[in-house]
Swiss-Prot record:
The active site is at residue 95. One of its GO terms (biological process) is riboflavin biosynthetic process. It catalyses: (2S)-2-hydroxy-3-oxobutyl phosphate + 5-amino-6-(D-ribitylamino)uracil = 6,7-dimethyl-8-(1-D-ribityl)lumazine + phosphate + 2 H2O + H(+). GO terms for cellular component: cytosol; riboflavin synthase complex. NCBIfam families: lumazine-synth. (2S)-2-hydroxy-3-oxobutyl phosphate binds at residues 92-93, 134. It comes from Beijerinckia indica subsp. indica (strain ATCC 9039 / DSM 1715 / NCIMB 8712). Keywords: Riboflavin biosynthesis, Transferase. The lineage of its organism: Bacteria, Pseudomonadati, Pseudomonadota, Alphaproteobacteria, Hyphomicrobiales. SUPFAM superfamilies: Lumazine synthase (SSF52121). Pathway: Cofactor biosynthesis; riboflavin biosynthesis; riboflavin from 2-hydroxy-3-oxobutyl phosphate and 5-amino-6-(D-ribitylamino)uracil: step 1/2. Belongs to the DMRL synthase family. One of its GO terms (molecular function) is 6,7-dimethyl-8-ribityllumazine synthase activity. This is 6,7-dimethyl-8-ribityllumazine synthase.
Amino acid sequence: MAEPRRALAQMDDARISVGNARFLIIEAPYYEDIAAQLRAGAEAALTRAQARFDVVSVPGALEIPIALAIALDRAPALYQGAIALGCIIRGETYHFEIVANESARALTQLVVERKLPFGNGILTVETETQALERASVESGDKGGDAARAALALYRFSQEFGQVVEQAQIQAQRPVLTSGAR
């Protein structure tokens, strides 16, 4: 089996330091031990990047997009990014597909519409063993990966904003040309 690129896990957190930016972690601790590992990884990554963060819990993965929408509507300027954490383990019914697909769809739609730096740390797995391996800070660190994704997008938005400002300044300067031919 091919090994995934671990670029996010190997990213130097100091390189993506975000000063006082504030992030919202929304967790669905349906599986408490898995959620605790995801949260530990996310909090560690945010702390290393010198970000501030708040954590809220909701019952399940389907409630995460709704909670994020409420937070953004009630306090639109409070958060510069968000991280979703949770776990969906396949059972014997179609419910797995509904929860996995609809939570991902709703989150993607929301963060794209709002242009919000975001990291999705909602695991979708076949077994609890898979979930524990992926959530563990020592092995998979998917909570940390989700936080690093949000941090990287935040830095991108800041840096791209500076590029745009520089381009606008350049566009306003008069163009000097050499003499007429």
